């Protein structure tokens, strides 16, 4: 269906749906391609802002504020397309298309035991990320739900290389409640890769986890949490590598490339050549016969 026959609302839905499906690192490319098709700058700008805000939350887009990394997620959304950073105590809007911070405002935070624990966990997690990720980023947020305090830790690393025709993202999220003796950690690890040289191949792998941690003091909890994340992510990485190796050796080879059959029969090349001559240079009365012979030969 041509886009010209769609109403404005239908166009908005189509544009939004296509933009939110853009793989990590390819949002701007998808937006530019759609601009060539839509040719409506005002419509594309509005949809790009909305979809870009969702894209940032979905893939934990990293920023740098005052030299400190900030990960955007739905946990630090304030509304009206604004995000909040606990480290810098700033709220802002982020334009993904222009890669710019806008409308920056300062905010105060309540300094209590949970805030101190957040900073301690952040230090322990940053040490782990620096040791295990080439260009990793992490952030620890706090949230209050029904008078209960939670800490949310996010980790992100990516490699976007459109020149080599592939993009990859690793992210994980860990949530636990601030309890005095025992707390349950809920985590999710997510990996996505997109290869688009010769073939268009998308790979998504994720795993949900639940573990318990004893709480003695804040320093012990922070170190135990960092060790838990390291242990679970190492296991996940080893399992993913094993599965991808098996996939490349067996499934992909069978799906994307079919081996030539071994027939162990003699081929009558002379007959094939004569049949091809009939097809390529048909004479009166031989056209129908030649088509059937060629079809049988191909099958």
From Swiss-Prot:
Predominant place of localization: cytoplasm
GO cellular component: cortical cytoskeleton; F-actin capping protein complex; membrane; sperm head
Pfam (any one): F-actin_cap_A
Location in or out of the cell: Cytoplasm, Cytoskeleton
PROSITE patterns for the chain: F_ACTIN_CAPPING_A_1, F_ACTIN_CAPPING_A_2
Gene Ontology biological-process annotations: actin filament organization; barbed-end actin filament capping; cytoplasm organization; spermatid development
Modified residues (Phosphoserine): 2, 290
GO terms for MF: actin binding
Full protein name: F-actin-capping protein subunit alpha-3
Annotated source species: Mus musculus
Phosphoprotein recorded as keyword: yes
Tissue-specific expression: Exclusively expressed in the testis.
Subunit-structure text: Component of the F-actin capping complex, composed of a heterodimer of an alpha and a beta subunit. Component of the WASH complex, composed of F-actin-capping protein subunit alpha (CAPZA1, CAPZA2 or CAPZA3), F-actin-capping protein subunit beta (CAPZB), WASHC1, WASHC2, WASHC3, WASHC4 and WASHC5.
Functional note: F-actin-capping proteins bind in a Ca(2+)-independent manner to the fast growing ends of actin filaments (barbed end) thereby blocking the exchange of subunits at these ends. Unlike other capping proteins (such as gelsolin and severin), these proteins do not sever actin filaments. May play a role in the morphogenesis of spermatid.
UniProt keyword list: Actin capping, Actin-binding, Cytoplasm, Cytoskeleton, Phosphoprotein
Protein family (similarity comment): Belongs to the F-actin-capping protein alpha subunit family.
